[in-house]
Amino acid sequence: MPPRIPNAPSSLLLQSSACSGSSSRCTASRLPTWASSCSSSSPQSSQPTTHQQQCSSFSTTAPAHVQSVRRQKMFSWLDKKGSAYKEHTRQGPNLLGGQGKDGLAVPFPNNPYFKSQPVLSEGSREIIYQDVMEKGLPIKAVSAKYNVDVRRVAAVIRLKEIEKRWIKEYKPLARPYARAVMKMLPQTVLGGPDQKPHESINDVHVHSYTTQQLFVPVSESREFTREDAAKAFGDHILPVDKKLRVPELIEFQKDLLKEVPLQEANRKFLNATAASEAKIAEREAKRRQAVEDAITRVKTDRFEFRFQEFNAENVGHDGRDRNAVGWRYGVPFPDRKRSQIKIPTKVE
């Protein structure tokens, strides 16, 4: 059963008057705001009547705006200490966590292990573009000069080419948005006297085969090198010297240890990086030419038909080789078929 509404006290009763016709109106009395009395516009309606009606105990007043202690502390912090983070008024990050011991910004104070990595400034990207495109320096040499990863240097050059092409085509650029974002991020400025390394450029990828422990018998008279260690883990494992993004730096450091003059070591390093990039460019050009030669083009008035020869037997050991015929259009995988092994059968 629903709860019964208790009777209201006598001091909160509504006085009803004999309202006749359309001349009656309802006016507020001196009772509380949620209690009102109905009185007639005639002078006789001001007399109290013997009929009294009990009012409901439900209140129609607005609830009091009572804040919890945590909410009060939150607004107090926003008005005092938090006001410094409301608007960005300086160059560089303005984060709540401040900076860590290594000088990197910490966005989240409760997670000091998450660091905000710096980005290349607009001037730094222009310097990289000029060194590669105007001065003709090899990409690996620019990467070693400014301690910027080779892939990042290549990305900067491509984006700069697009930007300059858009400027020539009079396309609008989001300059205000870029300035607002760059103003809030830590930046690396290249070319200055106190230039700092932007990132590590010789991080080596750890292959899963090299994480296991091996016991290899080696004679005392034999010199066990990094190439021998890589061959012990597998014939397809490359040594560390060949895994680096800029392996020419190893020979450069060896020349410095041999007390070769710095200018001579720099000249040899530039020649080695230029020869390496020329070899990569030649190999890529041959690959593209081979792909182009394998395609027969037949042009019509409306379309261009491209024919390429395929061997239907080259489908791989499971019939799903990525270079096989029809791989692009796909074959349904047997994942939902019965008697199919869906769990790994070996550990790699």
Swiss-Prot record:
Residues 37-57 have a biased composition (Low complexity). One of its GO terms (cellular component) is mitochondrial small ribosomal subunit. Residues 37-63 are annotated as: Disordered. Pfam families: Bot1p. The keyword Manganese does not apply. Signal peptide: none annotated. It is found in: Mitochondrion. Keywords: Mitochondrion. The keyword Mitochondrion applies. Its main location: mitochondrion. Disulfide bonds: none annotated. GO terms for biological process: mitochondrial translation. GO terms for molecular function: structural constituent of ribosome. Component of the mitochondrial ribosome (mitoribosome), a dedicated translation machinery responsible for the synthesis of mitochondrial genome-encoded proteins, including at least some of the essential transmembrane subunits of the mitochondrial respiratory chain. The mitoribosomes are attached to the mitochondrial inner membrane and translation products are cotranslationally integrated into the membrane. Component of the mitochondrial small ribosomal subunit (mt-SSU). Mature N.crassa 74S mitochondrial ribosomes consist of a small (37S) and a large (54S) subunit. The 37S small subunit contains a 16S ribosomal RNA (16S mt-rRNA) and 32 different proteins. The 54S large subunit contains a 23S rRNA (23S mt-rRNA) and 42 different proteins. Belongs to the mitochondrion-specific ribosomal protein mS45 family. This is Small ribosomal subunit protein mS45. The lineage of its organism: Eukaryota, Fungi, Dikarya, Ascomycota, Pezizomycotina. The gene is mrps35.
